[in-house]
UniProtKB/Swiss-Prot annotation:
GO biological process, one term: peptidoglycan biosynthetic process
Free-text function comment from the UniProt entry: Cell wall formation. Catalyzes the transfer of a GlcNAc subunit on undecaprenyl-pyrophosphoryl-MurNAc-pentapeptide (lipid intermediate I) to form undecaprenyl-pyrophosphoryl-MurNAc-(pentapeptide)GlcNAc (lipid intermediate II).
Keyword Kinase: no
Keyword Glycosyltransferase on entry: yes
Pfam families reported in the protein's UniProt record: Glyco_tran_28_C, Glyco_transf_28
EC number: 2.4.1.227
Chemical reaction(s) catalysed: di-trans,octa-cis-undecaprenyl diphospho-N-acetyl-alpha-D-muramoyl-L-alanyl-D-glutamyl-meso-2,6-diaminopimeloyl-D-alanyl-D-alanine + UDP-N-acetyl-alpha-D-glucosamine = di-trans,octa-cis-undecaprenyl diphospho-[N-acetyl-alpha-D-glucosaminyl-(1->4)]-N-acetyl-alpha-D-muramoyl-L-alanyl-D-glutamyl-meso-2,6-diaminopimeloyl-D-alanyl-D-alanine + UDP + H(+)
Originating species: Thermoanaerobacter pseudethanolicus (strain ATCC 33223 / 39E)
UniProt pathway annotation: Cell wall biogenesis; peptidoglycan biosynthesis
UniProt: UDP-N-acetyl-alpha-D-glucosamine binding residues: 10-12, 124, 166, 196, 297
UniProt-recorded name of the protein: UDP-N-acetylglucosamine--N-acetylmuramyl-(pentapeptide) pyrophosphoryl-undecaprenol N-acetylglucosamine transferase
Primary location recorded for the protein, binned into one broad class: membrane
Location in the cell: Cell membrane
Length: 364
């Protein structure tokens, strides 16, 4: 069978598609898989690295105000529809799967008009506009959170599957993770992750936190590449002594080690990050990004908070003092920390890729 994936822009739209594609190949060795994305998205790096073919089309998001840019966007949308149509005619997929991003619009719309079976996957608790529109035309809507169902009009099409994750994340033990990262096994490890682009408020708050931290506490700050030098400069300016219990790095390619080793993780609330930390049962303090569409990260974070798997601190309320108090409370009350871990695993859906694969087969 031939499978076409449309998704791109950010890792949050691409990683689920890759996970589903790998699940397909696990079950069908001879399956043909093609990815369609944009020319500037992260898919240009991630998809070929995983060994999949990628084709790109012209597309960009619509501005809400009428302007010259809006007219340009409409023109690009028409071009994108034509390019999507050409790819569909050439590849002749048996099914088309959309995992988010502007590229899904023209590809899924053309596929639906041609009568090709279609499925979309929504990663966030609050669905994006593109997926809400496409839900009227596709055969199945897979969602990651039970809370998402109410936002779709055609609820009979909606199936809760969870977010597909990379299976390698589950294979590393805590001892292996600590060893691989170069930390001691007899001291708690606090990890902060700002995401690939970094989060200045989280990073700078963590630098302030270092002034208060206990000597028996280990800290890993993953700054994001574009924030790394700023953070080092702030550490220098604040004259903070960094010993072997503290590591500050720009990026980590082996997040399976990080999730396995962390006692508490401080991070944003992107859907894929949350799927990964719940799968590993990591207690978390979530700082939702206020800079995303529809405030969807706070919606995601509140799901974990409601389940007792996380504490949520809004960025505007984040201080080193508040962070220190939360962390100290959790470390001083191991039964609470253990309960958070258990609650995280209870809401995880590690079989999401398998569920989505079965859904795909049910419509083809």
């Amino acid at each position: 069978m031939k499978y076409l994936f449309a998704g791109g822009g950010t890792g949050g739209h691409i990683y689920p598609a890759i996970a589903i594609a790998k699940e397909i190949l696990k079950n069908e060795k001879n399956a043909q898989i093609l990815f369609v994305g944009t020319k500037k998205g992260l898919e240009n790096e991630l998809v070929p690295r995983e060994g999949f073919e990628l084709k790109t089309i012209t597309v960009q998001g619509f501005k809400r105000k009428l302007s010259l840019d809006t007219l340009k966007t409409i023109y690009k949308a028409m071009v994108g529809l034509k390019e999507a149509n050409n790819i569909l005619n050439e590849f002749k997929p048996d099914v088309v799967i959309g995992t988010g991003g502007y590229v899904c619009g023209p590809v899924l719309m053309m596929a639906a008009l041609k009568g090709i079976p279609t499925l979309i996957h929504e990663q966030n608790a609050f669905p994006g506009l593109t997926n809400k529109v496409l839900s009227r035309f596709v055969k199945v809507v897979a969602v990651s959170f039970e809370e998402s169902v109410k936002y779709f009009k055609n609820k009979e099409k909606v199936v809760v599957t969870g977010n597909p994750i990379r299976r390698e994340l589950l294979k590393v033990t805590k001892e292996e993770g600590l060893k691989n990262l170069g930390f001691y096994s007899d001291k708690p490890l606090i990890v902060s992750v700002g995401g690939s682009r970094g989060a200045e408020k989280i990073n700078f708050t963590m630098v302030e936190f270092l002034k208060q931290k206990d000597k028996n506490l280990q800290v890993l700050i993953i700054t994001g590449a574009n924030q790394y030098e700023k953070v080092l400069e702030k550490v220098k300016t604040e004259t903070i002594d960094i010993d072997e219990t503290v590591k500050i790095i720009p990026y980590c390619h082996n997040m399976q080690d990080v999730y396995a080793a962390a006692d508490i993780i401080i991070c944003r609330a992107g859907a894929i990050t949350l799927a990964e930390i719940t799968a590993k049962g990591v207690a978390s303090i979530l700082i939702p990004s206020p800079y995303v569409a529809n405030n969807h990260q706070e919606y995601n974070a509140r799901v974990l908070e409601k389940a007792g798997a996380s504490y949520v601190i809004l960025e505007k309320d984040l201080t080193a003092e508040k962070l220190y108090k939360k962390i100290k409370y959790l470390l001083d009350n191991p039964q609470v920390l253990s309960k958070m871990r258990d609650n995280a695993q209870k809401i995880s859906k590690i079989d999401a890729a398998e569920k989505i694969y079965k859904l795909i087969k049910s419509i083809t």
